[in-house]
């Protein structure tokens, strides 16, 4: 998976005072988590306005403080914070920016967070058997592809879905476990992403799965 931008910083400019009703720009419908490190979680870009100029602000996610800072002279605040960690499935979360000087000045937004993952069922099967592929975290409005590599070379690319089936980038498909005639024994690498052409460093979210093909011998 590509490294998801996930730095935490509140930035404030300088301008003449001008206060309005507190509001926040809408959040994305879903964010992606691929690990507990901030760099493994998608960045949430926050923009809120209407606070007391230079007021002290606190940003929380699900009541947990993520960062603090001050509004600018316009009463505006921007922040870039990592999405919350999600190890399995998806869930909703609430992001809140509140002001210390005036507790009534509160801006909030809700969204969802999903883990990034791909599952093959059953896990053990003949390479030619049709199995179920499912995944989540592929949130681009684009097709979802699977690239099969062996020995460092792309052997086949298939399309699992024309587009994700939900805002959190889910898909399901039934395909041959390895769509190659008589695949060689050894470790095959399946990379699922949203790019038609394979790249070891894709520009979309990606998940890699190792499929081990073993050689069987018939008794005489």
Regions found by a protein language model. Give the residues of each.
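Secretory targeting and sorting signals
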Residues: 1-21
